[in-house]
Amino acid sequence: MKHFLRMLIQVCLFFYCKFLWRCLKFVMRKLTGRCELQRICYNTKPGASRTMKIETSLRDSKSKLLQTSVSVHPDAIEKTIDDIMELKKINPDINPQLGISLQACLLQIVGYRNLIADVEKLRRESYDSDNPQHEEMLLKLWKFLKPNTPLESRISKQWCEIGFQGDDPKTDFRGMGLLGLYNLQYFAERDAAAAQQVLSDSLHPKCSKFSKAEWEKKRMDKAIGYSFAIVGINITDLAYNLLVSGALKTHFYNIAPEAPTLSHFQQTFCYLMHEFHKFWIEEDPMDIMEFNRVREKFRKRIIKQLQNPDMALCPHFAASEGLINM
């Protein structure tokens, strides 16, 4: 009975707050002469703060047009903006900037949804050793990470040198599908020097950029490495979940002035690999069995950073040269 009453009170409070919010929006429109979309665009700076407010306003609207606008095809965005302006009785000649601002926001919102679909498609595609394209990507990964060491054969214990678990890497891609391979190859190709350094450090953590004095100060005398490729696939899983949960909206809405793309996602992966590598060394785990603890602590730190509406996980290395800050 108590549970039922608690649920009833929560439902009543929800509808009461919703009613009050609609009343407040009505009063604000009468006082300012502007609808909620206008107030957001005129009073909030471009980036995640504005786009996320616009997204919430559209999604929670009573209008079917506004509700569905967040999932239209990119080619239909311009017409959708015209329809919204007409619905809200806003003259585009008097308010030319509003249409431009709304279009920028919708490009980001729709682009984020499409990015999830693109990433999900790669995640669901299994690695196929009979597919020449898949095999070529895998062999390129080796060449980028070990340019001076030829791979003796496709099935080889050498794969363990770059962090795979066995002599055939295809079994390690089961969890993240081709997405894991795409990310690893992107990191190794676009930021070869950094990727090779991270690989070297993962094998020999004491040979990293920390000086001997810093090692002693941080008491990292027992520092251990990790499996580069396996951790890369695991960080791919982290990036994927941040994307699907919406946590990465803050980042993408701040760095992509239009629709975020797969390249933006891969650049984010590169950033996470850099940051996790530093975090792992700083945490100085006793053994590899502490990986899940360190990863969870790292995940919480990233999520906390992304709760800041001004946050952008902008890496300062070669792979990030294509990023555009707003």
Swiss-Prot record:
Domain ELMO: 133-306
One Pfam family recorded for the sequence: ELMO_CED12
Name of the gene this protein is made from: ELMOD1
Bilayer-spanning residue ranges: none
The protein, known as: ELMO domain-containing protein 1
GO MF: GTPase activator activity
Assigned keywords, A-Z: GTPase activation
Purpose: Acts as a GTPase-activating protein (GAP) toward guanine nucleotide exchange factors like ARL2, ARL3, ARF1 and ARF6, but not for GTPases outside the Arf family.
Protein species of origin: Bos taurus (Bovine)
InterPro entries reported in the protein's UniProt record: ELMO_dom, ELMO_domain-containing
